[in-house]
Amino acid sequence: MANIKASKKDALTSEKRRKKNSSRRSMIRTFVKKVRVAIMSGNKTTAEDAFKKMQPIIDSHVNKGLIHKNKAARYKSNLSLQIKKISKI
């Protein structure tokens, strides 16, 4: 543990941020998983609804710096392609 008062405060705020960020990352994973489950079930409308709910959340987390913009783009691109493939099957 830190000895200097400012260092102690930094350690506490760092811990608070870590907990909040891990919760937010978990939320992102949950939303992506919901879309993947909907895709696997073959229900296009459910998959599209889940995708529409996921997109703004991922975008807001990119703006906050929680995930990299390329990772968010990759998530959205891959999942949208998989949703489009549902109708072709």
Curated annotation (Swiss-Prot):
SUPFAM superfamilies linked to this entry: Ribosomal protein S20
Comp. bias regions, Basic residues: 16-26
InterPro entries to which the protein is assigned, alphabetical: Ribosomal_bS20 (IPR002583), Ribosomal_bS20_sf (IPR036510)
Entry keyword annotation includes Oxidoreductase: no
Swiss-Prot/TrEMBL GO biological process terms: translation
Cellular component terms (Gene Ontology): cytosol; small ribosomal subunit
GO MF term list: small ribosomal subunit rRNA binding; structural constituent of ribosome
Keywords assigned: Ribonucleoprotein, Ribosomal protein, RNA-binding, rRNA-binding
Pfam families named in the record: Ribosomal_S20p
Disordered as annotated region, ranges: 1-26
PANTHER family xref list: 30S RIBOSOMAL PROTEIN S20 (PTHR33398), SMALL RIBOSOMAL SUBUNIT PROTEIN BS20C (PTHR33398:SF1)
Annotated family: Belongs to the bacterial ribosomal protein bS20 family.
Record-linked HAMAP family: Ribosomal_bS20 (MF_00500)
Chain's role: Binds directly to 16S ribosomal RNA.
Name the UniProt record assigns to this protein: Small ribosomal subunit protein bS20
The organism of origin for this protein: Buchnera aphidicola subsp. Acyrthosiphon pisum (strain APS)
